[in-house]
């Protein structure tokens, strides 16, 4: 896959992730859309392969961070937030054991 195709794929992936992460939050959806479009337009004439690779890495990292670390909160009262985790953020509750396993 050529570099322009990879850039376009990252652009689309960021927008899909934005739609999932900020679902039902019009203000956050619009702000994220504007920021993504602004950053891509700002660098659309970049020709240096190293710089493009660096920016692609940054975009991929941002997408991963949005997907794995952002959770929505809804104001339900004056000082109360209700967290709305997405299904892909939930993990099974696994027992924690800090003792090393014994070799036999």
UniProtKB/Swiss-Prot annotation:
It comes from the Eukaryota. The modification Phosphoserine is found at residue 60. CDD domains: Complex1_LYR_LYRM7. Coiled coil: none annotated. GO terms for biological process: cellular respiration; mitochondrial respiratory chain complex III assembly. The keyword Mitochondrion applies. It is found in: Mitochondrion matrix. Its main location: mitochondrion. InterPro entries: Complex1_LYR_dom, Complex1_LYR_LYRM7, MZM1/LYRM7. Pfam families: Complex1_LYR (PF05347). One of its GO terms (cellular component) is mitochondrion. Keywords: Chaperone, Mitochondrion, Phosphoprotein. Belongs to the complex I LYR family. Interacts with UQCRFS1. Assembly factor required for Rieske Fe-S protein UQCRFS1 incorporation into the cytochrome b-c1 (CIII) complex. Functions as a chaperone, binding to this subunit within the mitochondrial matrix and stabilizing it prior to its translocation and insertion into the late CIII dimeric intermediate within the mitochondrial inner membrane. This is Complex III assembly factor LYRM7.
